[in-house]
Amino acid sequence: SEQLEKIQLPTEIHRKLRSIKYLHYWKASECASFLHYASIVILKDRLPTDIYNHFMLLFCAVTLLSSTIYKDKWQFAGQFLDRFVQDFDKVYGERYMSSNVHNLQHMFDEVQRFGSLSSISTYPFENQLQHLKRTLRSGFRNLEQAINRISECDEFHLSKSNSQIKFPTVAVKGNTTTVHVRPGFQLRNNLRDSWFLAKDEKIVKFHETNQCSEHDIDKITIQGYELCVKGLIFNDPIESSEIFIFKGCTNSLSESLMEMSIEQIKCKLVAVHTNRKHEAIFIPLIHTLV
């Protein structure tokens, strides 16, 4: 639980991971964050090897099916899920087999039909359930009440949409520089928002921007320090580099700054520190992959 609570998820993930003692109260988005970013580190030294390897089938499959960037590997994800379900009763016992476990075998077909898991996920609506509930004044004709209240709110909704905002943009407040790279993707010179992966697979720690003027957004370049020591974190059922996951030493940074354009950035990275000094696992923030 202590290691779990110390994980600093990036700004784009609004819910901080809570202690395992609150597991019964975790929201669906917290479970997703644990699976995508914390699980392979937290479970590594806490599960027997055979159970951990079985879990990795699920982790890799869900990761692959969560982005169209991995579309050429979706078929492998389907195979991993088949193996996960087939071996489930051997690992956990037949009494834990359920329809939810069986339904994993249909995930590949559904993703092929409707799109990546991220594009068909309902996580963004999770926080809106409370607002829907508040639109109801009685138990009579609930749906009509909700529709009427939402329609009324839409008439007064004046907030800007992302389509009205030009990307990238730079904001400086004190010693903190924030680059809004793309919708839902920020780089900031702090602990949890500074790591990103370049398209040539270099891991870089963001330091500063180089911009000719406040309005010259087309000439923004990113400056940062390259991580010199990195390697694979696993090689089964596929190599971690195939899904852009690496381990690295956070104090092995290049001495000189490197500079690149926004177009050279592949994705933001979530840095999850292990129990080894200065070692971190770098995992792509799924929705920022291009």
Task: Identify the role of each PLM range.
Residues 1-290:
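Terminal interaction-prone segments of large eukaryotic proteins
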